[in-house]
Amino acid sequence: MNINQLILRNLKKNLRNYYLYVFALIFSVALYFAFVTLQYDPAINEVKASIKGAAAIKTASILLVAVVAIFILYANTIFIKRRSKEIGLFQLIGMTKHKIFRILSAENVMLYFGSLAIGVAAGFSISKLVLMILFKIVDVKADAKLHFSEQALVQTVIVFCGIYLLIMIMNYTFIKKQSILSLFKVTSSTEDKVKKISFFQMLIGALGIVLILTGYYVSSELFGGKFKTINELFVAMSFILGSVIIGTFLFYKGSVTFISNIIRKSKGGYLNISEVLSLSSIMFRMKSNALLLTIITTVSALAIGLLSLAYISYYSSEKTAEQNVAADFSFMNEKDAKLFENKLRESNISFVKKATPVLQANVDIANIMDGTPKEMQGDPGNMQLAVVSDKDVKGVDVAAGEAVFSGYTDLLQKIMVFKDSGVIKVKSKHETQPLKYKGLREEFLVSYTFTSGGMPAVIVDDSLFKQLDKDKDPRIQLAQSTFIGVNVKHDDQMEKANELFQQVNKKNEHLSRLDTSAAQKSLFGMVMFIVGFLGLTFLITSGCILYFKQMGESEDEKPSYTILRKLGFTQGDLIKGIRIKQMYNFGIPLVVGLFHSYFAVQSGWFLFGSEVWAPMIMVMVLYTALYSIFGFLSVLYYKKVIKSSL
């Protein structure tokens, strides 16, 4: 057999054994090329958000390269170690290290650049689809065209050639450093030896669980009123991050082994074949991969959490728009409102107009606040709030000497908590009126321009409102003292009405609920698009790494399967244990990552939107379904190994 035949044979073998690596490499190249193509596509700037579309895509492509580079280099480390005995045999038959390096380099050139070429072709073919997905998410009305960019091609080739150069340096360093004897010991030295579990290890296991639970508890109290300053919040967030990450590392280092040992002892040491194959492997292998599993779990939690928060903002855009704009269309002056009404009538669009007089008054709300944040902006004893008459609020009749608050965001409900009752003081220019606070309504009566961005409006008796109007403080009144809202009666006429609104709103001083919702969808749609694809890339790469580790374990355990089958155990007996083992190997990092992301999202979801459960559950279910594919593939590989063991 000559060198060329040897290279081709090894290449064929590698393609058969590491097809998932080739797939992940092709997928990564395709996604990167598609992203870079979008970056240079003129159509991307049709995405009207508060950030430039091309700039966002460029940032995403840099993060994508980082994820892909780490995956490829780590996967290469696994492969070169798995082939250490093969390299040792080459040296035993007289090959020099330089010649062995040339053989490996030739294999990698064909495998790597073949995948690169296929990936670029695939990336070009899906670039239009990716652009269509982006336009759909951000609700942009534009045509997506298939666009080939030479700049994108050059950038992709340069980036992946750089990664390939790093692979070659790693391989050369590995071959140069290893002696023949050490090459035959590489795989056997990578796992911890089976030994009795020490008290120290049990202590580490217990400490890991305590640290994780402590981090969860602090995260649940983050905005509950216990941390009242920015510095306190920063320290608490830093503690949560450190506690959960260190706890996760200790969990894999000791907790899993500790819990598995408790299960084993509870059975008196008598384990069936399924328990032997699952528990034993987890007890003595998982802790050797503690750092890797910690990174995978942490980044999985980060990806799920960020995607959940972005989707919460996207999902809540319409409700957030309803909170910010109290009618379909809100006007700051009567002149433009009249012009808009005339245009609606000319187009036969039915509508209802409502004008609500609004006063600004300083209100002492200190008595009804349940705790006062130390760094709260504004004085609770002199808070500027919008005041409206109960006559202008349908279905509300406020008695003399009483007041009702209406309209309050989820964010303010977490940061500024009101009691159920108490006394507030409404101040006019010369007088102060004490009023009994009678509770909080959800309805937003006026747009955010009247309410300092989301504070509640105060509903008072009409006679008191007239009195306050006569004695109002002119220094705090807004230029517009009347909220003018226009609601379109039929939803199917909303788009047309919004087009007419754009003709009137030339100075962007008025508000459209539809435009406000679209702006939020555009911004967070872009974030969701980027985080979604980055999360998908990480999911595939991390799933592949776990799969490769299982491939290595299955080959190491092959002699054990041979013995077990000779003892009379069937393939079905062994596969049953393997399924349980893979549920642990893939399930534990997934479940821990889901818990991390759940508590992270729960601690601050209200900063991003008004709906939490539906978006979060959808993201978690989708991530779990895709992640489970790798567990299924690893079971199939084990089946093949068990079948060939006898």
Swiss-Prot record:
Where does this one sit in the cell?
A: Cell membrane
Stretches that traverse the bilayer: 18-38, 60-80, 115-135, 152-172, 197-217, 232-252, 290-310, 526-546, 588-608, 616-636
Transcription among keywords: no
Cell membrane among the record's keywords?
yes
Q: What is the induction note for this entry?
A: Expression is induced by bacitracin, via the two-component regulatory system BceS/BceR.
The superkingdom listed in its UniProt entry is Bacteria
Q: What is its main location?
A: membrane
Q: Which UniProt keywords apply?
A: Antibiotic resistance, Cell membrane, Membrane, Transmembrane, Transmembrane helix, Transport
The record's section on InterPro entries has: ABC-4_Integral_Memb_Prot (IPR052536), ABC3_permease_C (IPR003838), ABC_permease_BceB-typ (IPR027022)
Report how it sits in the membrane: Multi-pass membrane protein
GO BP terms: namely: response to antibiotic; transmembrane transport
- Cystine bridges: none
Question: What Gene Ontology cellular component terms go with this record?
Answer: plasma membrane
How does the annotation summarize its subunit structure? The complex is composed of two ATP-binding proteins (BceA) and two transmembrane proteins (BceB).
Family label: Belongs to the ABC-4 integral membrane protein family.
The entry's function note states: Part of the ABC transporter complex BceAB (TC 3.A.1.123.5) involved in bacitracin export.
* Protein's name in the database: Bacitracin export permease protein BceB
Q: Which organism is it from?
A: Bacillus subtilis (strain 168)
